[in-house]
């Protein structure tokens, strides 16, 4: 009874709090000639991959027999698996199981292939709150009884090594706080499986994360590594029509991160309603620092299972239609998998259909997800993962590969032609326009694009944030005007024409 009342009271307290606006001044973008690697890492368009089941255990991917199965019974949440192992083994022995798992997984990463062949820009690495500084911050949290195991297994040390290895290959890292205390959703990949998503209803959990755990991640892992592209503060938050707890936590988390490391992107979940969070980000003036993560799977819902593959593919431009004019989006997870019921309704060559499905997804993402995509997932303990695996999807030509090179040659005559075309169209329309703003816009865009290409042949991403900041700089330098739309059109035309392979 007391516990029930306490939970209701905590929920009431959170629901009465509105999220605060950004309280930190963000650093200005450098001019194109001074763009550094750290800035490009944070803004470039990503061709990425998830390291699923490395830290947050998922037995269907890795470690099923070695850690997650005890006396013939499989445990699909990490908390349950480690708790059961401790009934049979010492903390030292269970920690060794984990550290052996980390080593096996990491040793199998082919960095040369990732960098040179797949030409991946970034890794999304799911972690749990229990991994941060090897379990140092578990007081009053559900994983507290398992602290000693993580102290000995040293996942934080392994994460640091991964980040350094990625840096050597010019690969970025997105630290994804996949597992939150109480869970942001009801699934076992939150670390525990209680059947409820309690995190956003318990203020003590949210406070612990934004006051203690996020600062620890930043101070020990992100500040010293230029290839950290962002910090994801939640994974797959549940849909909520009135998400006051989410808004409270996100605003506190964003402000915590930006006070400690101004300019570090903060990634939030779309809660399966992209427009809801675009509106909120816009309202709170977070759009220059926040990226909204949306996951695209077409193999789980009854609605998708009822369709044939060709219908799903045809619908992608309509079903993946983020409001990208209002905010920056990334597809943090997607795959080439369709359900068996879908395949039962589909005729034709399966490999060809999977190829069309994956290629169409990537093409749609390139128009609406300004921070790119992260395929789920890198590798499996046994086999290549098939339509869940990066390697087979790359090797079959299903996923696009970025070309190599770092020297974009832009035809000056093409730029002059575009400028002339603009002037010719608008001249004689009855006003004295400011076509020089259009020219400034397209030339600034081209300079930025060339600067990005010089680092690992990167493309400009986070278009909403990038354009907004460049526009503000321009207005500050050359004053506002009723003809700023000409600059807007010029910069956008530059992106449309030249920010592509």
Curated annotation (Swiss-Prot):
Subcellular localization: Mitochondrion intermembrane space
GO molecular function, one term: glucan exo-1,3-beta-glucosidase activity
Keywords, ordered alphabetically: Glycosidase, Hydrolase, Mitochondrion
Active site per database record: 236, 333
KW Hydrolase (keyword) present: yes
Domain of life where this protein originates: Eukaryota
Annotated GO biological process: glucan catabolic process
Class in the EC hierarchy, top level: hydrolase
Enzyme Commission identifier(s): 3.2.1.-
PANTHER family per UniProt: GLUCAN 1,3-BETA-GLUCOSIDASE 3 (PTHR31297:SF43), GLUCAN ENDO-1,6-BETA-GLUCOSIDASE B (PTHR31297)
Record-stated family: Belongs to the glycosyl hydrolase 5 (cellulase A) family.
Note: Present with 1960 molecules/cell in log phase SD medium.
Protein name per Swiss-Prot or TrEMBL: Uncharacterized glycosyl hydrolase YBR056W
Species in which this protein is naturally found: Saccharomyces cerevisiae (strain ATCC 204508 / S288c)
């Amino acid at each position: 009874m007391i516990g029930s009342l306490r939970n209701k009271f905590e929920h009431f307290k959170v629901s009465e709090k509105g999220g605060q606006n950004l309280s930190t001044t963000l650093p200005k973008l450098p001019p194109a000639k001074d763009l550094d690697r750290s800035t490009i890492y944070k803004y470039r368009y990503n061709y990425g991959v998830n390291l699923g089941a490395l830290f947050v255990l998922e037995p269907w991917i890795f470690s099923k027999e070695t850690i997650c199965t005890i006396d013939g019974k499989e445990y699909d949440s990490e908390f349950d698996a480690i708790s059961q192992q401790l009934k049979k083994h010492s903390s030292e022995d269970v920690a060794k199981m984990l550290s052996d798992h980390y080593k096996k997984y990491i040793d199998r990463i082919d960095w040369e292939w990732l960098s040179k062949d797949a030409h991946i820009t970034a890794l999304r690495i799911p972690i749990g709150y229990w991994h941060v500084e090897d379990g140092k911050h578990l007081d009053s949290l559900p994983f507290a009884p398992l602290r000693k195991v993580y102290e000995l297994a040293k996942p934080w040390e392994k994460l640091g090594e991964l980040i350094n290895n990625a840096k050597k290959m010019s690969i970025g890292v997105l630290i994804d706080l996949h597992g939150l205390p109480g869970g942001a959703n009801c699934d076992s990949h939150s670390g525990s499986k209680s059947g409820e998503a309690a995190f956003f209803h318990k203020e003590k959990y949210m406070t612990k994360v934004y006051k203690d755990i996020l600062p620890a991640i930043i101070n020990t892992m992100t500040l010293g590594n230029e290839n950290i592209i962002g910090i994801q503060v939640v994974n797959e938050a549940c849909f909520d029509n009135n998400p006051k707890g989410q808004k409270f936590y996100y605003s506190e988390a964003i402000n915590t991160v930006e006070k400690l490391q101004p300019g570090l992107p903060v990634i939030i979940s779309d809660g399966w309603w992209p427009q809801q969070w675009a509106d909120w980000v816009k309202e709170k003036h977070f759009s220059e620092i926040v990226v909204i993560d949306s996951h695209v799977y077409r193999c789980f819902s009854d609605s998708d299972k009822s369709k044939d593959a060709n219908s799903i593919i045809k619908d992608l431009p309509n079903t993946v239609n983020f409001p990208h004019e209002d905010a920056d989006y990334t597809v943090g997870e997607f795959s080439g998998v369709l359900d068996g019921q879908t395949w039962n309704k589909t005729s034709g060559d399966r490999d060809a259909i999977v190829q069309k499905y994956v290629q169409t997804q990537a093409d749609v993402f390139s128009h609406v997800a300004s921070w790119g995509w992260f395929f789920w997932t890198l590798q499996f303990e046994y086999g290549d993962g098939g339509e869940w695996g990066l390697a087979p999807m790359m090797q079959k030509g299903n996923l696009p590969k970025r070309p190599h090179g770092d020297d974009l040659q832009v035809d000056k005559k093409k730029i002059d032609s575009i400028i002339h075309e603009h002037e010719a169209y608008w001249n004689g329309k009855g006003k004295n326009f400011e076509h020089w703003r259009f020219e400034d816009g397209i030339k600034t865009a081209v300079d930025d694009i060339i600067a990005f290409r010089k680092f690992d042949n990167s493309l400009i991403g986070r278009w909403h944030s990038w354009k907004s900041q460049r526009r503000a700089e321009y207005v500050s330098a050359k004053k506002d005007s009723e003809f700023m739309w000409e600059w807007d059109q010029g910069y956008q035309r530059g992106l449309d024409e030249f920010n592509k392979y």
